[in-house]
């Protein structure tokens, strides 16, 4: 590898896939890449791969891929059998949104909530802002005012 890898997607477990697709689209502007699919253990290549990934307890899940502005996607999972993922999940996803306060307000107004009481500067006296929220399903979303590279470049 000659440089850092590109982030391609973040997997997020939700309890209602259809609602999550609408929520991530309406609130944050993500767009479905294709239709939602159902994957069953032992059903075709996808079922074989999923059974290998999730182990013998896996039965089936529903899945959707949502496109973001910079090519990084969100991969939504609704585990049906068993009804939730039995492994530890991600801590958070981070989205560069520009107007952190406005997006945090939209999240809180549509079934999510703010975890931090305010929008914080990441560094004192600099324009890079952050706020932690939760989506309508309890997953942590960190909001950035700028890209990760711009925020963290040239730090000692």
Specify the residue positions occupied by each region the protein language model found.
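Vicinal oxygen chelate
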Residues: 1-3, 7-15, 35, 60-75, 79-108, 129-134, ...
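Short secondary-structure boundary/capping segments
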Residues: 2, 54-56, 65-66, 84-85, ...
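Core segments of cupin and vicinal oxygen chelate
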Residues: 13-70, 102
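Short, glycine/acidic-enriched loop or turn micro-motifs at the edges of active sites
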Residues: 19, 78, 145
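Residue-level detector of anion-binding/catalytic polar loops
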Residues: 31, 73, 113
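A short acidic/small-residue loop/turn micro-motif
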Residues: 40, 81, 147-150
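Short secondary-structure boundary micro-motifs
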Residues: 48-51, 79, 114-118
